[in-house]
């Protein structure tokens, strides 16, 4: 997992940005030449149940050859601590612009981009919209977004398997005129690493297609625990599949009892109205919370007069 080893330095490419050699992109990179081999007592506990091997049982909840559990925990704290500082900066910038930001996460092939383009079409031009698009390579998805008339900045992560808050902050610098608008961050297709990385978003939205299997929330619990909403996508295919919708929802709520679930299909239009209504409700709640905070600040200042 990326919180253990970090991602390849110098791989990130952001459209519209001049390349800066040696730019610190927000990840911690340890030098394997100086890693001490752990003593057996420090190694990741291995739990064996029949033919099942469980390596994620130690404090780090992961295993990396040559790294002790304590060292892995320290690396994770360093990486996520640095990322969280960038995320806080992003969140402050977004809030200053009254910009509502969603982080769309899923496995590859879940239909994120198709769902996003349909969402953009249905939202219309009532307020500013933009997309930050994450992929390891190519700008294919960003081109699809731009075809709708909405600006999109492509972030290529190279060997990196997720976006981090520093990448998003740099990509956001390429966008303008988003006051009071919506920003969608389409993360790299990956149900593991993006779960741990706050990008400064208001909500993580997990997209699970009915072609993937109903037990995905149990196999990748961190992602569904981190998400506030699960979009059960490609429901138009259900007549052709052996997919247990109720079991899938139950699994998601076993991991995260508070997760909201909406069944959607960009092709048939099922659930799209409910999805858009959820966006509007959450955006409104965010704005009202900010108004209340500003009023409280104003009252505190008035008390000083």
UniProtKB/Swiss-Prot annotation:
Keyword tags: GTP-binding, Hydrolase, Metal-binding, Nickel, Nucleotide-binding, Zinc
GO annotation terms (biological process): protein maturation
Taxonomic superkingdom: Bacteria
Binding positions (Zn(2+)): 161-162, 193
Region called G-domain, residue ranges: 101-262
A Pfam entry, by short name: cobW
Residues that hold Ni(2+) 2 according to the record: 161-162, 193
Binding site for Ni(2+) 1: 2, 5, 7
GO molecular function, one term: GTPase activity
Family: Belongs to the SIMIBI class G3E GTPase family. HypB/HupM subfamily.
Protein's job: Involved in the maturation of [NiFe] hydrogenases. Required for nickel insertion into the metal center of the hydrogenase. Exhibits a low intrinsic GTPase activity, which is essential for nickel insertion.
Entry-linked NCBIfam families: hypB (TIGR00073), PRK10463.1 (NF007775)
Protein name: Hydrogenase maturation factor HypB
Species: Azotobacter chroococcum mcd 1
Lineage: Bacteria, Pseudomonadati, Pseudomonadota, Gammaproteobacteria, Pseudomonadales
Gene name linked to the record: hypB
């Amino acid at each position: 997992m990326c919180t253990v080893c970090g991602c390849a330095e110098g791989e990130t490419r952001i459209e519209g940005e001049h390349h800066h050699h040696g730019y610190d992109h927000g990840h911690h990179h340890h030098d394997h030449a100086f890693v001490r081999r752990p003593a057996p007592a420090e190694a990741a506990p291995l739990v064996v149940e029949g033919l099942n091997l469980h390596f994620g049982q130690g404090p780090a909840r992961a295993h990396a050859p040559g790294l002790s559990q304590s060292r892995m925990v320290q690396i994770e704290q360093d990486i996520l601590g640095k990322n969280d500082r960038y995320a806080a900066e992003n969140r402050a910038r977004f809030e200053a612009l009254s910009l509502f930001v969603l982080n769309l996460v899923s496995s590859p092939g879940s239909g994120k981009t198709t769902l996003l383009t349909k969402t953009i079409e249905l939202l219309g031009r009532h307020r500013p919209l933009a997309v930050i698009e994450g992929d390891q390579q190519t700008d294919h998805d960003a081109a699809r977004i731009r075809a709708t008339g909405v600006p999109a900045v492509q972030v290529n992560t190279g060997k990196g398997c997720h976006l981090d808050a520093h990448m998003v902050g740099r990509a956001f610098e390429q966008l303008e005129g988003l006051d009071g608008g919506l920003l969608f961050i389409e993360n790299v297709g990956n149900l593991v690493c993006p779960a741990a990385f706050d990008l400064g978003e208001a909500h993580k939205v997990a997209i699970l297609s009915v072609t993937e299997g109903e037990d995905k929330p149990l196999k990748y619990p961190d992602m569904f625990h981190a998400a506030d909403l699960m979009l059960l996508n490609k429901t138009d295919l259900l007549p052709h599949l052996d997919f247990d919708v109720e079991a899938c929802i139950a699994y998601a709520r076993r991991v995260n009892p508070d997760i909201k679930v909406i069944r959607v299909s960009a092709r048939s239009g099922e659930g799209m109205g409910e999805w858009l209504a959820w966006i509007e409700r959450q955006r409104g709640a965010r704005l009202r919370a900010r108004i209340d905070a500003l009023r409280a600040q104003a009252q505190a200042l008035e008390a000083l007069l």
